[in-house]
Amino acid sequence: LMAQATTTMRLRTCVTNPATREPTVTASALAVLDELSGGRMDLGIGRGDSARRVLGKPPTSMKDLEQAVHVIRALVEGRGIEFEGTMLELPWTSGHQLPVWIAGYGPVALKLTGRIADGAMLQIGDPDLIRWFVSQVRDSAAAAGRDPNHVQVMAAAPAHVGDLADGRDRTRWFPALVGNHVVDLVNKYPREDLPEELTAYVRDREGYDYLHHAEVGSSNASFVTDEVVDRFCLV
């Protein structure tokens, strides 16, 4: 509907993952939407958090994420590629270039973004943290011989206009959601590899119920202070 009802705006998945949606299926769907929109389709992809954890499974590996990006990009752009031992191609595609946006916070994800992606998707509104993320992406792009300024950045955070206290309560779920990614990073990386402003607020987190994922008023957000809401959201 959006592809056929618009003429200039770009369209993007926000975000898919290679675990719950097989890469060739994603590629086929994107190729169709790219054709319908006249070449305005982008891929937004990550490791998969709630989509996997609600099934009791971990997000996909960075290796599988990178492979999925290469497979989806090649197929949508009309190029053949080997995947799981088979040469694949979608000969009917329009052949338009597929911009790829990777969602992630950790050093490895940010380096991957700088190395192979067209854009970084950051679920956060804190300007200082965004600067840190952007520096990681651009340093990686430069190390890969790419122009760092060609890698775009999108900061995705909820916004609320109205009463301040009400706005904080209605957006408090968002830092709690982000906290799931942050806990993964804390468990994976040395403390000095991550900004203190990103990791400190999850230390009092007791757990997360995925049956109430991204839910306004959920007890998942009980550990999130007003100060954290103000940093992560636009209220």
Label the model's feature ranges.
Residues L1-T13, L98:
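N-terminal beta1-alpha1-beta2 module of alpha/beta enzyme domains
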Residues A5-T8, S37-G39, L112-M121:
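Glycine-enriched alpha-helix->loop->beta-strand junction motifs that scaffold or abut catalytic
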Residues L11-C14, M41-I45, V100-A103, A120-L122, ...:
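Hydrophobic faces of well-ordered beta-strands that scaffold small-molecule active sites
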Residues T16-P18, G46-S50, Y105-P107, G125, ...:
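Active-site beta-loop-alpha junctions enriched in small/polar residues
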Residues A19-V32:
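Glycine-rich anion/phosphate-binding loops
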Residues T26-A29, G104-L112, R170, V235:
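Short, acidic/polar
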Residues P58-L90, I130-V235:
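An alpha-helical appendage that flanks or caps ligand/catalytic pockets
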Residues L98-A141:
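Loop-centered beta-sheet repeat module
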